[in-house]
């Protein structure tokens, strides 16, 4: 009986050590290049205001299964939105305040959620990432307009010699590029934006 209990205790201790060893402390900074969108500029003057939470966005997670993750993407998020918005509208500028009113339309993006999955969790041979955005809109004189919500999705296959950090970073970069493509096509079609562009273009 004593040997049996000792064996169980040792097995539990070994399992705990293995689980602890599998936990990771990971810090990533997402870097990506957004291609120039092939779009026709809308005849609107637009300003974008980036809240600090967006400009410095950092995903953090600590769980027993995954360990501790810290993923920085704020700089890349700002560059991606600037890249797309500057090509979408005839006039574009960054604003220091969401109340600045020298433009016809003010865009205030927020990140609602970021998620990712790894091959060992899904059983597939690729990493996946999702970034959900809420784009708040208002006119230059402060009238709030219906917001637009969309999700960027990315995936990256596991490389034979690449670490999981590389695979995850690549899937997040892919999600940002996908978000840029959706922003380029979806925002101009969003009714409040489309209607104002049509009126201005008359």
PLM feature segments, named:
Residues 37-41, 128, 134-150, 184-201:
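Short secondary-structure transition/capping segments
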Residues 75-97:
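Mid-chain, structured segments of secreted extracytoplasmic proteins
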Residues 63-74, 141-189:
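Short secondary-structure boundary motifs at beta->alpha junctions and helix caps
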Residues 21-83, 188-202:
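A structural "domain/chain start" motif
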Residues 23-31, 95-147, 156-158:
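Surface-exposed short loop/turn segments
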Residues 86-94, 180-188, 192:
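Sec-exported extracytoplasmic/periplasmic mature domains
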Residues 1-22:
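Sec-dependent bacterial lipoprotein signal peptides
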């Amino acid at each position: 009986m004593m040997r049996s209990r000792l064996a169980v205790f040792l097995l539990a201790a070994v399992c705990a050590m293995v689980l602890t060893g599998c936990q990771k402390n990971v810090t990533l900074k997402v870097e990506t290049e957004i291609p120039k969108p092939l779009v026709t500029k809308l005849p609107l003057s637009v300003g974008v205001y980036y809240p600090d939470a967006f400009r410095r966005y950092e995903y953090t997670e600590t769980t027993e299964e995954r360990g501790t993750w810290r993923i920085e993407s704020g700089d890349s998020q700002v560059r991606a939105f600037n890249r797309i918005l500057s090509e979408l509208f005839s006039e574009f500028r960054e604003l220091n305040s969401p109340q600045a009113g020298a433009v016809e339309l003010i865009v205030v993006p927020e990140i609602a959620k970021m998620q990712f999955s790894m091959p060992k969790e899904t059983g597939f041979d690729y990493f996946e990432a999702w970034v959900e955005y809420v784009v708040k809109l208002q006119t230059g004189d402060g009238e709030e307009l219906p917001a637009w919500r969309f999700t960027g999705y990315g995936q990256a296959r596991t490389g034979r010699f690449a670490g999981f950090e590389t695979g995850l970073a690549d899937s997040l970069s892919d999600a940002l590029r996908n978000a840029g493509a959706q922003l380029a096509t979806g925002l101009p079609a969003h009714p409040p934006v489309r209607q104002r562009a049509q009126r201005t273009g008359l």
